[in-house]
Each structure stands twice: as C-alpha cells, then as structure tokens.
Amino acid sequence: MPDKSTIEKAKKDKAEGKSASTQAGEFVHDEIEKIRKGKHGARSPQQAIAIGLSEARRAGVDLPAPKTGGEALKKKAAQDEKRGKSNKPVSAKRSRARVEALKKEPTNTVSSGALSKQAKKAAKKRSVTDRSKAAKKAATTKGPTQRSAAAKKAARTRARKK
C-alpha cells in the first residue's frame, strides 16, 4: 500500500500538469526507498519498478499499459487500472501475504549500481532519435538555471569521456 505522502506528491504532479509517468515515478521511488530501508525485498530492479507502477495504477494514476510486453503484463496493467477506479478496500490477508513473500527476497537489488545497470540496459533498448527527443522534451520543462546546470554537467561528462 503506498504512503499518503506518495499519493499527495503524485496528486501535486498531476495538478502541475506533469505526465502520468512522472506521477508514477513517485510510487517507484517510494518502493525503492522501502526496499532500501529493509521493509521488504525484491528479486530484481525490474520487479521493484513493476511493483511501483502497479501501485500507481491502483492509486488512480492514468498510466496506460505498455505497448510492448507479453499478454500477462497487459492483463495485469488492465486489472490494476480497473482496481484504481474502484473503491473496494484491499484485503488485509492478501496484503500481508504479499509483504511476507517479498520479505524473503534480497534488498541489494535496488543498490545504486543495480539501478544504474538497469537504467543503462533500458536506455540501450531505445533508439538514438527517441532518446534525443526525450532529452529535448526534458530540457523544455526545465527553467533557465536548471538548463544551464544540465548543460554544464553534460559538458563535464563529454570532457571526461575524451
């Protein structure tokens, strides 16, 4: 079950006109923090992300099912979306069983190294034009000071790679 503060952050993001994936990012971040604190574990970084996205859909974030992916994934996303629209409370027994199962999983799967590896792997799957388009879109949402800081950081990275 997501924290009230996470739901509030997601609502704030929605009010600011941010995308559904940004709103869902709050839930993913919350899930990673829970695992790092040792409340429970995850088998892989992908599982931690999937749990966060599922919680986001169940909390009412209008996050569509992914275009790519298997039938089971799309079915689960649709199920979560439907759950987000209903007001039926979560069964305590089911919720407890979920946490108990996750407690048996490792917590080192969301270390900074593991998440960095996951992010790089995910980025490699995207085309250069797609990544470039996303970067340009991100730049437009930043203010001038943030843009300047990002440009300086990019310049430092380029200099380091030479």
Task: Name what the model sees in each region.
Residues M1-K162:
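A charge-rich, low-complexity, intrinsically flexible signal that marks solvent-exposed coils, linkers
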